[in-house]
Curated annotation (Swiss-Prot):
GO molecular function: dihydroorotase activity; zinc ion binding
UniProt function note: Catalyzes the reversible cyclization of carbamoyl aspartate to dihydroorotate.
Upper classification of the organism: Bacteria, Pseudomonadati, Pseudomonadota, Alphaproteobacteria, Hyphomicrobiales
Class in the EC hierarchy, top level: hydrolase
Quaternary structure annotation from Swiss-Prot or TrEMBL: Homodimer.
GO BP terms, alphabetized: 'de novo' pyrimidine nucleobase biosynthetic process; 'de novo' UMP biosynthetic process
Pfam families to which the protein is assigned, alphabetical: Amidohydro_1
Protein name (record): Dihydroorotase
Binding site residues for Zn(2+) 1: 13, 15, 99, 247
Active-site annotation: 247
Catalytic activity: (S)-dihydroorotate + H2O = N-carbamoyl-L-aspartate + H(+)
UniProt: substrate binding residues: 15-17, 41, 136, 219, 251, 263
Organism: Rhizobium meliloti (strain 1021)
Binding site for Zn(2+) 2: 99, 136, 174
Length: 347
């Protein structure tokens, strides 16, 4: 057996949903993670500081007794977002970031931004006060191929925005392409990127080869193998601009296994086992802690966690359920398509 001790990790991009789903999935995160940036794309979305405060209370009420977990709240950017409310939420310590969803880009994004100019007053205020903007980096215009959405977003939205507001701190969330990795590496100032567990493991073949596999469908969609390999190199590099954001996104199985299935992969329960496998495979276990526990806090201006967790490599594969049951219905767990031998033994 082999033990690996790392500081307790954080998740810098997490969907907890609400109600019965929230109560069903929260323990899979709070068991191992200290903090998480909580996505605001509920129905209705978390638009105001009051919305965020109320949602935070619902999350805290759902955390199992004995778990120590802090939800880091975000606001859903709209073309009518009030800069004063955003600043007040930030100054109070409640709001840690604002999320830009291009309208129609992903689950519950219909209230998102269609014209970036209409959101400039709040973006300018965020640049002034140092509040990060988290972006879903895809365009949604019909003429752009779905596999090119990220590259086109960088060229037509992100780069012009950064030139217009160079002091705005931007997290390019769930980077999925070599284009995204290279852009972050080449533009050091006020730019970082989160990487999901599943994009380090699957490429688009996982979705399409041998039949449609809806439980590997997510947005941004998995890309070619060359992009997956670029993501791996970024994750294991130790570069402080790259960190874990699982984008773990639960949907009940009937909404995934249908003619128009939802986008999202549920990875919270086995993310650390998957990541230990990936980093060991790349000969980079010594840099797992940076990716999961150090780089994210540094970017968001928070201290690294003092507590530690222990990952133990064992001969027998770790057993995870194929699905979890929630009050909302069954949720299929991400299958990495290889056995997992790293287990969290102390958290």
């Amino acid at each position: 057996m082999q033990d690996l001790v790392i500081r307790r990790p954080d998740d810098w991009h997490l969907h907890l949903r609400d109600g019965g789903m929230l109560r069903g999935v929260i323990a899979d995160t709070s068991r191992h993670f200290a903090r998480a940036i909580i996505m605001p794309n509920l129905v209705p979305p978390v638009v105001t500081s009051a919305d965020a405060a109320a949602y935070r209370e619902r999350i805290l009420a759902a955390i199992p007794a004995g778990d120590r977990f802090e939800p880091l709240m975000t606001l859903y950017l709209t073309e009518g977002t009030d800069p004063g409310d955003v600043e007040a939420g930030f100054r109070s310590g409640l709001v840690k970031a604002v999320k830009l969803y291009p309208a129609g880009a992903t689950t519950n994004s219909s209230s998102g931004v269609r014209d970036i100019d209409k959101a400039m007053p709040v973006l300018e205020r965020m640049a002034e006060i140092g509040l990060p903007l988290c972006v879903h980096g895809e365009v949604t215009t019909a003429e752009v191929d779905i596999f090119d959405r990220e590259a086109v977003f960088i060229e037509t939205v992100l780069d012009p925005l950064r030139r217009r507001l160079p002091d705005l701190r931007i997290t390019m969330e769930h980077v999925t392409t070599k284009d995204g990795v290279d852009y972050i590496r080449e533009h050091a100032a006020n730019l970082a990127g989160s990487i999901t567990t599943h994009h380090l493991i699957i490429n688009r073949n996982a979705i399409l080869v041998g039949g449609i596999k809806p439980h590997y469908y997510c947005l941004p969609v998995a890309k070619r193998e060359a992009h997956r390999l670029a993501l791996r190199q970024a994750a294991i590099s130790g570069d402080v601009r790259f960190f874990l954001g699982t984008d773990s996104a639960p949907h009940v199985d009937p909404l995934k296994e249908c003619a128009c299935g939802c986008a999202g992969i549920y990875t919270s329960i086995n993310t650390l086992s998957c990541l230990a496998h990936v980093f060991e495979e790349e000969g980079a276990l010594d840099r797992l802690e940076a990716f999961t526990s150090l780089n994210g806090p540094a970017w968001y201006g928070l201290p690294a966690n003092e507590e530690t967790i222990t990952l133990r490599k064992q001969e027998e594969p770790v057993s995870y359920p194929a699905r979890i049951e929630t009050e909302a219905g069954p949720v299929t767990v991400f299958d990495p398509m290889f056995p997992l031998h790293w287990a969290v033994t102390q958290a």
